[in-house]
Amino acid sequence: MSNALLLRKFLRQTATAVLLGTAVVGLSAIVACGDGKEAKHAKVPSGPMPENETWTGVYFHPVYGHLHMIEEGANVVGRWKRADQSKWGELSGTKGGNVLHYTWKEHTVGMVGASATTHGKGYFQYKMDKEDRPILDGQFGLRDDEVGNDWHNVKQARMTPDLKSIGGDSEGIKPGGF
């Protein structure tokens, strides 16, 4: 075999080994590290629920509309329809004192497929404002994040929650139902 053929064979084997080694190391880094981001969690202390107050009720936000919530033991479920009627959502979570940690889904009206629904986590802290009105002070995040977007609601007097009035599921949702 000539020196040129031996050199070409050596270079081809070396290049193949380097490419395979690089691919294995790169794939290992991707699998081991994921996307490198950790979920963001709320650091909100739980306190006692304000006297004579309950999570059950209807709350209002100018963008997210009316949020209907029902408390069942340690669980709270809710549904909302945006003020512009473009989306509706559902949440389910566990309360501890005046703090509720929940998971949520929001569905775009008239849209189907994977992009029609977004989901995430969030929290609410039940408080009384300066005028002694009950409010929900909280945030929600996308996917595994629990924070990132503010969501503040004022509890509406003399409104009864009706989960069945919102969304595409006539049965409503049950605690932990999604």
Q: How would you describe each model-predicted region?
A:
Residues 42-132, 140-178:
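Central antiparallel beta-sheet cores of small beta-barrel/beta-sandwich binding domains
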Residues 34-36:
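Bacterial signal peptide processing site
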Residues 3-20:
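Bacterial N-terminal signal peptides that target proteins for export
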Residues 29-32:
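C-terminal motif of bacterial Sec signal peptides marking the signal peptidase cleavage site
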